[in-house]
UniProtKB/Swiss-Prot annotation:
The keyword Mitochondrion applies. It is found in: Mitochondrion. GO terms for biological process: mitochondrial genome maintenance. Required for respiratory activity and maintenance and expression of the mitochondrial genome. GO terms for cellular component: mitochondrion. It comes from the Eukaryota. This is Required for respiratory growth protein 8, mitochondrial. It comes from Zygosaccharomyces rouxii (strain ATCC 2623 / CBS 732 / NBRC 1130 / NCYC 568 / NRRL Y-229). Pfam families: RRG8. Keywords: Mitochondrion.
Length: 280
């Protein structure tokens, strides 16, 4: 067997260490250049928010004024979000019917509380929300006990049982329609007192027997036969009794002209009424 000298072993160890690549104990973290980090808002669905001190500053950047404060649909969509009790979906509350849980005023009733719809939303008492549709609610009225506000059911101060809540199922929708009809009539008659020439974005309330849409954006003639773009509504879809009101109180050849900036409540009530009758 050949003999290996001690010098050979020594040179082998020295050369091995000399030519080996040193591995750092803590590896260097590379710079974060991935678009998942640098372009976060593009893939995450998050939007960048721009903050302006006032409206004039917005215009100084060349951003167009869309006049959303006078736009019916923008105002409906910008209303606070609420959860609909039947499908548990959140949507702007202007698209929903508000229900209130309150003490009953009828001394003959054995129920201490009552759940009923209201036309004008408010923060008083405990509230819940359901879709503003006559057809849908008439199908779901049998299970209306689940419409009781969750805040009342989960409150530590709860003092009632479900059997203590009165829900007049037979007149539930009829009473709502009566309140809505009465309030809308008053607001339309009041709005008709203003003699307005249609402008872009105005609401025209008509009774068009030949019309095939309850609400649409269309052309309307103004001063000097100028064509303006307006929101055209048709009360034919609410009922025949509205024809007389339009004929008696029209303030324009097309019908009753309403300006959102001057009669916001009337316009929202009108949309609420059309949605109630036409949403399926």
């Amino acid at each position: 067997m050949p003999m290996i000298s001690d010098g050979f072993y020594k040179n082998l160890l020295i050369n091995r260490v000399r030519h080996s690549t040193r591995v750092p104990i803590l590896p260097r973290v590379p710079d974060l250049t991935t678009p998942l980090v640098t372009k976060f808002e593009k893939w995450s669905g998050k939007r960048r928010k721009l903050f302006f001190q006032n409206e004039s500053q917005i215009h100084s950047y060349g951003i167009k004024d869309f006049e959303l404060s006078n736009n019916l649909f923008a105002q409906l969509l910008s209303s606070p979000m609420r959860s609909e009790r039947n499908c548990k979906t959140k949507m702007p509350k202007e698209f929903l019917m508000q229900l209130k849980l309150s003490s009953t005023q009828n001394n003959d009733s054995s129920k201490s509380l009552g759940l009923a719809p209201v036309v004008q939303h408010s923060k008083l008492n405990k509230n819940s929300y359901v879709v503003n549709s006559r057809d849908i609610l008439s199908q779901q009225i049998s299970s209306s006990t689940k419409w009781v506000p969750i805040a009342a059911l989960t409150s530590q101060m709860r003092f009632f049982q479900m059997q203590d809540v009165a829900i007049d199922k037979s007149n539930f929708l009829n009473k709502y329609e009566e309140m809505l009809n009465s309030l809308l009539r008053d607001r339309l008659i009041s709005a008709s007192a203003s003699k307005l020439e249609p402008q872009d974005g105005d609401v025209i309330v008509r009774f068009d027997k030949d019309g095939n849409r309850p609400i649409e954006i269309g052309q309307c003639k103004s001063i000097g036969n100028k064509e303006v773009k307006a929101i055209l509504t048709n009360l034919k879809y609410i009922g025949p009794t509205w024809e007389q009101l339009i004929n008696e109180h029209r303030n324009h050849e097309e019908g009753i002209v309403i300006r959102f900036s001057e009669n916001e409540e009337a316009v929202k009530l009108l949309y609420k009424m059309l949605a109630y009758h036409y949403t399926h």
